Amino acid sequence: MEKVLLPHTDLEVSRVIAGCMKLGGGWTGGVVVGETHAAQASAFIAGALDAGVNYFDHADVYAWGNAEEAFGRGLALTPGLRPRIVIQTKCGIRWKDEPAGAPHRYDFSRGHIVASAEGSLRRLKTDYLDVLLLHRPDPLWEGEEIAAAFAELKAAGKVRRFGVSNMNAGQMAYLQHFLDEPLVANQLQMSLLHHGFVEAGISFNQGSEGYPQGWEGALEYCRLNGVALQAWSPLDKGLLVGAPLGSMSPAQRAAAELLRGMAAEKGVPPEAIALAWLLRHPAGIMPVLGTTDPGRFAACAAATSVRFSREEWYSLLEAARGRPMP
C-alpha cells in the first residue's frame, strides 16, 4: 500500500483510508455495543493493517455513536496498537430531537465542537485525535468561534490537526482566514460516477448541461493550499463493480462494462480499477473505503499498483459521462 505524508503534518498515512461507518451494528436503532462488535472491530483493524491501511475515518454520528464505541473497544483488545494508526473523526451534525423538540441541524458552535470531540475521545478510548473534521457546513458558523474551539482542543492535546468535509473553495478560504494553522483535509464525494470535481473544469464555459454546481475552484484551492482531498463513497456503494448490468442506466452500464474489462485485462479486482481512476488524478485523492470485510482491503490495495494511461483514464470518464467530451 502506498504511503504519503498528510499535508502540513509528520503523519505517514496510507493512500486508501478505512471508513468505519458500518461498525457497531450500523444504523439499526437500539443496538448496544458488546463483545461481538468489539471483536468485529478488532478484526477490521487487523485486516486493514495487514493490507497496509493505517488511516481510519470516523464521525461522531456514525451508527449513532456506536461505530466509534465498537472501534474503541476493538482497539483496546490489542494493547500498544494506538501509535501505529491514525484516527480521524468528524463533528457538527446534530440529529432531530437532540435535545427533545430540536430539528435536524448542523452545529459549529464552540461548545458543541469541543463536546463532540471529547465524546469521540471517550468512545474511541484514546487520549487524542489525530485529525478532526467539520462534517457539513453550518450556515450559522462564526469563524472566530470555530478557531477558539480548535485552539482549546489543540492546547489540551486532544486534537492534533483539523480539516473539513463537504466544503467549497469559498468556505475553506473563509475558515482558514481565522485559523493559526492550515487545514489538512477536505472530504468530498468523488468517484467515477460522481465526477463533478472533473466536470467542473471540463464543462466550464460550455453552457449549463451537466455542469456541477458548487465545485467551482474547490479542487484548485485544495491543490494550491496543500489540503488533502479525501473521497467518500469512492465505489458508489459497489454499483459499477458488482451490480447487475440490467439495473443500470446506459452510461452506468457502459462505464461498468469498460471498468470490468480493464480489471480482467490488468488482473485486478474491479474495485481496484474504480479506485485507481481516482488515484490517477494528480490532486493526490485519498479514497475512503467503507467496508466491514477485512479481506476487501487487500483487493482494494491493488489499486495503488494499477497504472492508467491518459487514454484509459479518459475512456472511463467519457463512458461515465454518457456523452462525448466537449
Regions found by a protein language model. Give the residues of each.
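Short, well-ordered coil/turn segments that N-cap beta-strands
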Residues: 11-16, 52-54, 81-85, 126-130, ...
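Active-site groove signature of glycoside hydrolases
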Residues: 121-140
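A short, structured active-site edge motif that brings together acidic residues
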Residues: 83-96, 187-192
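Acidic/histidine-rich helix-loop elements
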Residues: 22-35, 97-107, 199-200
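Beta/alpha (TIM)-barrel catalytic core signal, keyed to glycine-rich beta->alpha loops juxtaposed to Asp/Glu
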Residues: 137-326
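Short, acidic/polar
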Residues: 34-48, 108-124, 170-173
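N-terminal binding-site loop/beta-alpha segment at the start of enzyme catalytic domains
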Residues: 1-86, 155
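Short catalytic-loop micro-motif centered on adjacent basic/acidic residues
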Residues: 55-62, 133-134, 160-163
